[in-house]
Swiss-Prot record:
Component of the RNA degradosome, which is a multiprotein complex involved in RNA processing and mRNA degradation. It comes from the Bacteria. One of its GO terms (biological process) is RNA processing. It catalyses: RNA(n+1) + phosphate = RNA(n) + a ribonucleoside 5'-diphosphate. Its EC number is 2.7.7.8. PANTHER family: POLYRIBONUCLEOTIDE NUCLEOTIDYLTRANSFERASE, POLYRIBONUCLEOTIDE NUCLEOTIDYLTRANSFERASE 1, MITOCHONDRIAL. SUPFAM superfamilies: Eukaryotic type KH-domain (KH-domain type I) (SSF54791), Nucleic acid-binding proteins (SSF50249), Polynucleotide phosphorylase/guanosine pentaphosphate synthase (PNPase/GPSI), domain 3 (SSF46915), Ribonuclease PH domain 2-like (SSF55666), Ribosomal protein S5 domain 2-like (SSF54211). Residues 553-612 form the KH domain. HAMAP family: PNPase. The lineage of its organism: Bacteria, Pseudomonadati, Pseudomonadota, Gammaproteobacteria, Enterobacterales. One of its GO terms (molecular function) is RNA binding. Mg(2+) binds at D486, D492. It comes from Buchnera aphidicola subsp. Acyrthosiphon pisum (strain APS). This is Polyribonucleotide nucleotidyltransferase.
């Protein structure tokens, strides 16, 4: 019999329901988690056997949105969901980040979490309930897990923090912050803001963490009633004799290697030491486990680096704890791009380009919460050569998508509106060197490249990555961390913003016990570092260029009467197609009569504008127009006096004298001047040649007429 076990509770303005025991009973745990009408079904499956040679914790999180959740059928030929969208990948990462640090350090069993959106209210984003559902499922599974965690979205509207605001409210919010943590510790923060102060961001983090305690308590209550027996895990004992031998013989060598400032030289030296250790002990005992030697080696590396930092010695590359690496800033280095910059910070380097396009280049996004158009694209590429390695080159991986999204969010607060700058903007960051915080280098490079492209951003944006080493009550904050400091430290805290405040933030903790005071200090240290970087950037380029690149399309905007749109488009698009081909421009028309003409050549755009104005001009009775004969019939001739406007010159209106045959007086494609006699109720034009003054009808006048 199916035996549902349910917890239902109020969470801010929403009702949360967690149900287990009915669906997917062969998984280690399964939870149907819902926030009002948005429901996510989360399963957890773990392997009790560790794969041979496993060196890292193989946790996989899959987040998938089913279109039936919104009552829709997928598009495309196959009419079914395909590869994960960018939003699905980003949400999977959001679920993963607060959960990963809560597994035991030596736990190497494969775990898969699958979160499937099965019902969605467009006003309630599924990401928060997905984290809650995953936390609940892990807590029920019996898998070793130091949870549960809660999650909350915090908005900031009218100087007040709002818990889990609905989508409509988020449009008026100056903050979109997601925070997740355990009862006592904050583990993950992801935020985008409209230039808020450090104090307001910290207040939002604390508010969100306090509010989510009700979630944690209810998951614990559910776990007490429905959790499975905990796994019995035996971790292999470390060979203490081997560890002591390696420490006594090689710790000093490893310590000396970590005073080599150059990353590649340091890696080469460390690899050489490791190879010597493995060779030495294999010669003594051919059956020795080399993986164990590597584990001991990594443990010594971590101990050496952390001990040096905590004892206030210089860091790996010789810097003090709050020192920023040497900066080199260059703009306009790619001659044919619309904007470019090269931002170098120590051994981390980003080559950024900006391309301007029309609204046709915008990305149409078919998302579960509704369709939307994105006019600002940010793509981050991390090729293997950036870290001196050989690797696969292809479609972007999850990490690249996540870093690109963070960099994009860092810039959104300063981007111009479409009304002020009607371009689609694509930014591409090529990471050409990497040794820590390449995403924040991308933010700095993108800010410079946008200004180089003439994009009128409100102010420059810079980013910095902060680190932390904590042992007991002692802790040291590090500014502008290296890759090794990220790997061997306890926190990765990325902060981006302007001189006035923060635009984006991403924080990932690897340990519990990070206090609010430490977060506050990290925010303040990040502000000082950000101001230093902005000062260097402003020396290279302190405002957007007044003109866009000569190679970028110029967009000219005119307004026409909406009733005239059909005249510009023509039957089956014939007129606008002809205009586009003949003028060499791109013409876009909106329903309100806004016409955008884009071209890299100013004269071509002017020509297109002139011809559109001719088409949309109001025909006045009694006015004389230049026209072209388009058809000759027995009873007269049809004359075009502008694209889409054709009138009849009756045979009686050709001349004062009797006209026996129209073709004796007029020829096809002949340019003539005509006078508008009448516009009937159906908009048809009655034209005349004979009514025009004889001076205008001179051959010279006719031959010089242009339409």
């Amino acid at each position: 019999m199916l035996n549902p076990i349910v917890r239902k509770f109020q969470y801010g303005q929403h009702t949360i329901t967690l149900e287990t025991g009915v669906i997917a009973r062969q998984a280690n745990a399964a939870v149907m988690a819902s926030m009002d009408e948005t429901a996510v079904f989360v399963t957890v499956v773990g392997q009790k056997k560790i794969h041979t040679g496993q060196k890292f914790f193989p946790l996989t999180v899959n987040y998938q949105e089913r279109t039936y959740a919104a009552g829709r059928i997928p598009g495309g030929f196959f009419r079914r969901e395909g590869r994960p969208s960018e939003n699905e990948i980003l949400t999977a990462r959001l679920i993963d980040r607060p959960l990963r640090p809560l597994f035991p350090k030596k736990f190497l069993n494969e775990i898969q979490i699958i979160a499937t959106v099965v019902s969605v209210n467009p006003q309630i984003n599924p990401d928060i309930i997905s984290i809650i559902g995953a936390s609940a499922a892990l807590s029920l599974s019996g898998i070793p897990f130091y949870g549960p965690v809660g999650a909350a979205r915090v908005g900031y509207i009218n100087n007040q923090y709002i818990l889990n605001p609905i989508s409509d409210d988020m449009k008026n919010s100056s903050l979109d912050l997601v925070v997740s943590g355990t009862q006592n510790a904050i583990l993950m923060v992801e935020a985008e803001s409209k230039i808020l102060s450090e104090e307001k961001i910290l207040g939002a983090i604390i508010f969100g963490h306090q509010q989510q305690q009700v979630v944690i308590n209810n998951i614990r209550s559910l776990s007490n009633e429905a959790s499975k027996l905990p796994w019995v895990i035996s971790y292999p004992e470390t060979n203490k004799t081997l560890e002591l031998k390696i420490i006594n013989s090689f710790e000093k060598n490893i310590s000396d290697a970590y005073v080599i400032f150059n990353k590649q030289d340091r890696i080469e030296k460390l690899n050489s030491i490791k190879e010597n250790i493995i060779k030495l002990f294999l010669d003594e005992n051919s059956n020795i486990d080399t993986l164990e030697i590597e584990d001991i080696f990594q443990k010594i590396e971590k101990k050496v680096v952390r001990k040096r930092i905590l004892s206030n010695q210089t860091r790996i590359d010789g810097r003090e704890k709050d020192m920023i690496r040497a900066l080199d800033v260059r703009t306009g280095i790619l001659p044919r791009t619309h904007g470019s910059a090269l931002f170098t910070r120590g051994e981390t380097q980003s080559l950024v380009s900006v391309t301007l396009g029309t609204s046709r280049d915008a990305q149409n996004l078919d998302e579960l919460l509704g369709d939307r158009i994105d006019n600002f694209l940010f793509h981050y590429n991390f090729p293997p050569y950036s870290v001196g390695e050989i690797g696969m080159v292809g479609s972007p991986k999850r990490r690249e998508i996540g870093h690109g999204r963070l960099a994009k969010r860092s810039l959104l607060a300063v981007m111009p509106t479409l009304e002020n700058f009607p371009y689609t903007i694509r930014v591409v960051s090529e990471i050409t060197e990497s040794n820590g915080s390449s995403s924040m280098a991308s933010v700095c490079g993108a800010s410079l490249a946008l200004m180089d492209a003439g994009v009128p951003i409100k102010s420059a944006v810079a980013g910095i990555s902060m680190g932390l080493v904590k042992e007991g009550n002692q802790h040291v904050l590090l500014s502008d961390i290296l890759g090794d400091e990220d790997h061997l430290g306890d926190m990765d805290f990325k902060v981006a913003g302007t001189e006035e405040g923060i635009t984006a933030l991403q924080m990932d903790m690897k340990i519990e016990g990070i206090t609010n005071e430490i977060i506050h200090s990290a925010l303040n240290e990040a502000r000082l570092a950000r101001l230093h970087i902005l000062n260097v950037m402003n020396q290279a380029l302190n405002e957007s260029r007044s003109e866009i690149s000569e190679f970028a399309p110029r967009i000219h905007i005119i307004k026409i009467n909406p009733e005239k749109i059909k005249d510009v488009i023509g039957k089956g698009g014939s007129v606008i197609r002809m205009l586009t081909e003949e003028t060499g421009t791109i013409i876009e028309i909106e329903d309100d009569g806004t016409v955008k003409i884009s071209s890299t050549v100013k004269e071509k755009a002017k020509n297109a504008i002139r011809r559109i104005k001719e088409i949309t001009a109001e025909i006045e009775v009694g006015r004389i127009y230049s026209g072209k004969v388009t058809r000759i019939v027995d009873f007269g001739a049809f004359v075009s006096i502008g694209l889409g406007k054709e009138g009849l010159v009756h045979i009686s209106q050709i001349s004062d004298k009797r006209v026996d045959k129209v073709s004796n007086h007029l020829k096809i494609d002949q340019i003539i001047s005509v006078k508008v006699l009448e516009i009937d109720r159906q908009g048809r034009l009655r034209l005349s040649i004979k009514e025009i003054d004889s001076s205008i009808l001179s051959n010279k006048s006719i031959n010089n007429s242009i339409i």
